[in-house]
């Protein structure tokens, strides 16, 4: 049995000729015929080469792997009970699901507070991020949860001003921070600025802290979609040259006269901008953390990807030793705005396995009374049941879940609906709910009451879409928690989920469902 689909995918806009008869190992048609125009990935690579490495079309899509891992979070079920309540009086009139508290506080001083136990954990310099930032920033701020400005935002900004080799002013980063802050209320939420190798060389964190007043900064080791640096596509020659001047790897060389001629005659239409891979050492990590604290950072986060177990151990150990405030662990499979497609599917430690190792490592340090940061886990999460399972799997160390593709989808849908309302071309599927923001978006009336008429009318529908999606997740999570009789997040435990297979139990250490409550059941039956 193969876990992977090879040589054909909607991600690369490729397909087989004999779609019903495929060789499972190569992904090739069982009869590869002379004269075929080459619609499969091999065939398309014969004429477009490296372009076919990446999902397409760039700039209007987000992407995640389609590989089916042997074990995933669907291999666990949530346990409910009829007895008692944790975090509230065991009273049927009090222990109702709207009373469930899903707020979370993190940070060395518990100074970061969020209405919801999830965050958007890195939206960077891709077009899909920039074009939907308004909805993502405002929606996140209104919901009172965190949003991370990802890597390369400053480096990609053509309007950045430099003075003596250091940033003196930005347009895009400043805009992104301001959009969030303008809608942040009562101190809930946080805007986080992330930095990779190139960002560090440009001193993005120092600028964000000292000039924009950003309190939360994140060191980026990697992400789940790839084990190389971030990349985007560039359609403008001058911008490609600018990025190379700023220290990025740009392919092909935008200053090569032959490349320029080929680009101008349309032989290719996009350059690739790549970031460098980091070189982690404890010494350099310690220096970076110390430098950020001296620059004025109040909270320091670390994000790591689906690297081998030793690197996960480094992330946990360094976060403990150097008092990091939040460690985010992103697992294999994506998502991304642009990453190599085969890499996304075939590298890294999958979610359940990575999160299980994370729990083991955190528990080991906790048993030694070592400091542990709050932990967030990523892994293709999109719904409340997955959030519950992830919090339970990593309890008591995992405090939040990181997401990106699902919130972007909600913001994009909200934006698109707004455009159809303005154009008076609402699709039938949507029109059955109404023909205005107030009728279509179920949270519109509460948002109008919260913001007032004037501010509500200015609210982008992308933000309403994200806020409404979050409202659904919040109610769904409260219902699941009430069913497990856990009325605040700190009461969720590993015993609140059960493994449906022996393999899932073996990997995670979560009890197999037939072994759950075995001793307690035996005692109850002694009547």
Language model: regions and residue ranges:
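Conserved, well-structured core domains of diverse proteins
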Residues: 1-116, 128-141, 146, 158-189, ...
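Cysteine-cluster motifs in flexible loop/terminal segments that predominantly coordinate metals
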Residues: 20-51, 368, 412-414, 419, ...
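A structural-propensity feature for long, helix-poor, extended segments
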Residues: 102-106, 158-189, 194-198, 422-456
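Conserved, mostly hydrophobic/aromatic
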Residues: 120, 140, 327, 390, ...
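Active-site-facing alpha/beta catalytic cores
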Residues: 122, 127-319
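Flexible, glycine/charged-enriched surface loops at secondary-structure junctions
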Residues: 150, 299-303, 368, 484-492
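Glycine-rich phosphate/ribose-binding loops and adjacent secondary-structure elements
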Residues: 263-449
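Catalytic or ion-coupling anion/metal-binding cores of large enzyme and transporter domains
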Residues: 395, 417-418, 422-424, 434-527
């Amino acid at each position: 049995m193969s876990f992977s689909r090879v040589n054909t995918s909607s991600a690369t806009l490729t397909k087989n000729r004999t779609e019903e008869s495929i060789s499972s190992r190569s992904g090739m048609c069982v009869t590869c015929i002379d004269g075929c125009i080459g619609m499969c990935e091999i065939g398309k690579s014969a004429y477009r080469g490296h372009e076919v490495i990446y999902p397409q079309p760039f700039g209007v899509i987000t992407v995640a792997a389609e590989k089916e891992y042997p074990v995933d979070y669907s291999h666990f079920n949530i346990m409910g009970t009829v007895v008692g309540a944790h975090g509230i009086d065991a009273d049927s009139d009090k222990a109702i699901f709207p009373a469930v508290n899903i707020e979370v506080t993190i940070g060395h001083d518990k100074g970061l507070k969020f209405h919801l136990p999830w965050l958007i954990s890195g939206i960077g310099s891709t077009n899909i991020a920039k074009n939907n930032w308004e909805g993502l920033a405002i929606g996140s701020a209104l919901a009172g949860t965190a949003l991370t400005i990802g890597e390369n935002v400053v480096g990609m900004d053509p309007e950045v001003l430099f003075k003596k080799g250091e940033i003196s002013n930005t347009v895009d980063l400043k805009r992104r921070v301001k959009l969030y802050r303008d809608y942040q209320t009562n101190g809930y939420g946080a805007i986080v600025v992330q930095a990779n190798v190139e960002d560090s060389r440009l001193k993005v964190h120092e600028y964000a802290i000292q000039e924009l007043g950003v309190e939360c900064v994140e060191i980026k080791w990697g992400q789940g979609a790839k084990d190389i640096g971030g990349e985007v596509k560039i359609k403008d020659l001058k911008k490609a040259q600018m990025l190379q001047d700023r220290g990025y790897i740009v392919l092909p060389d935008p200053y090569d006269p032959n490349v320029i001629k080929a680009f101008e005659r349309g032989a290719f239409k996009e350059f690739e901008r790549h970031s460098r891979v980091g070189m982690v050492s404890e010494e350099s990590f310690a220096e970076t953390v110390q430098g950020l604290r001296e620059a004025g950072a109040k909270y320091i986060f670390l994000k790591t990807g689906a690297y081998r177990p030793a690197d996960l151990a480094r992330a946990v150990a360094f976060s403990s030793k150097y008092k990091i405030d939040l460690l985010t662990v992103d697992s294999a499979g994506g998502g991304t705005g642009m990453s190599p497609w085969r890499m996304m599917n075939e590298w890294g430690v999958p979610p359940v396995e990575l999160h299980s190792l994370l729990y083991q490592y955190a528990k080991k340090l906790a048993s030694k009374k070592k400091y542990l940061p709050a932990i967030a886990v990523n892994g293709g999460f999109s719904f409340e049941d997955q959030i519950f399972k992830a919090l339970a799997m990593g309890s008591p160390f995992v405090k939040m879940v990181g997401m990106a593709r699902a919130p972007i989808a909600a913001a994009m849908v909200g934006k698109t609906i707004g455009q159809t309302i303005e154009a008076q071309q609402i699709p039938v599927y949507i029109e059955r709910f109404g023909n205005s923001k107030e009728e279509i978006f179920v949270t519109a009336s509460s948002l109008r009451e919260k913001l007032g008429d004037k501010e509500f009318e200015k609210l982008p529908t992308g933000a309403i879409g994200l806020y409404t999606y979050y409202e659904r997740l919040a109610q769904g999570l409260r219902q699941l928690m009430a069913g497990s009789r856990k009325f605040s997040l700190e009461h969720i435990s590993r015993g609140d989920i059960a493994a449906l297979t022996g393999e899932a139990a073996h990997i995670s250490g979560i009890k197999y469902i037939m072994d759950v409550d075995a001793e307690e059941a035996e005692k109850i039956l002694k009547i």
